[in-house]
Amino acid sequence: MNIRPLGDRVVVKMVETEETTKSGIVLPGSAKEKPQVAEVVAVGPGTVVDGKEVKMEVKVGDKVIISKYAGTEVKFDGQEYTILRQNDILAVVE
């Protein structure tokens, strides 16, 4: 079973990074800020705004930077994903 987002929505999986302070202390998950880098796992077909088709600018496999508190977090098949609108994606990491 797959997740197929609708409209201009994108499904991403957050990329966990180990956070270390300048003094070398590794922070536990509870002390970290919410990650903002994610990998795109599914892309909707796009949408129509004011009669004009809005195409999706990201594709599956892209690494993206998203707004800090964007989207809806969901669990599916034991994995955690975030579903958000394309507008909540700030940049593609190349």
UniProtKB/Swiss-Prot annotation:
GO terms for molecular function: ATP binding; metal ion binding; protein folding chaperone; protein-folding chaperone binding; unfolded protein binding. The keyword Amino-acid biosynthesis does not apply. Its main location: cytoplasm. SMART domains: Cpn10 (SM00883). One of its GO terms (biological process) is chaperone cofactor-dependent protein refolding. The keyword Cytoplasm applies. One of its GO terms (cellular component) is cytoplasm. Coiled coil: none annotated. It is found in: Cytoplasm. CDD domains: cpn10 (cd00320). It comes from the Bacteria. Transmembrane segments: none annotated. Keywords: Chaperone, Cytoplasm. Heptamer of 7 subunits arranged in a ring. Interacts with the chaperonin GroEL. Belongs to the GroES chaperonin family. NCBIfam families: PRK00364.2-2, PRK00364.2-4, PRK00364.2-5. This is Co-chaperonin GroES. It comes from Acetivibrio thermocellus (strain ATCC 27405 / DSM 1237 / JCM 9322 / NBRC 103400 / NCIMB 10682 / NRRL B-4536 / VPI 7372). The lineage of its organism: Bacteria, Bacillati, Bacillota, Clostridia, Eubacteriales.
